[in-house]
Amino acid sequence: MLVDASVIVAILSREPGYVELEKRLAAADTPLIVTPLVKFEAVVSLARQKSTPQKPTPSLVRQAQQAVDAMVEDISASEVPISSEIGRLAIEASTNYGKSVGHIADLNFGDCFAYASAKALGVSLLYKGNDFAHTDLA
């Protein structure tokens, strides 16, 4: 199962619904997977949450990275690289479900790569929110 950045952020920020996401991770009967882009998106999002109205400081980014890395280790997730196939599928995801084409799923850059990674690896995608519910991964 590919773990989307939205799940990592929700759990580390203790957003509403985070306990259910923790339970789903614990109950997963397949290996958990992240990508460098998932980690990047989670780090940036967490650092932004902790910042003042100004942009996050390098220290906040490093703290967020440590938190994300620790969570990935705690859930024993494997990190897989972004391949050419994933890149191709991300473009396809953007074409079919992206913000750029006005699709209701409204997938952004990170979402398109999470979608593509799950597709390329043939695994399910654990996410928070409604965006992926409007794709064929739902």
Where are these regions (language model features)?
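Residues that recognize and position ribonucleotide moieties
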Residues: 1, 32, 125
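Metal-dependent nucleic-acid phosphoesterase active-site entry motif
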Residues: 1-19
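PIN-domain endoribonuclease scaffold, especially VapC-family toxins
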Residues: 22-33, 37-106, 112, 116, ...
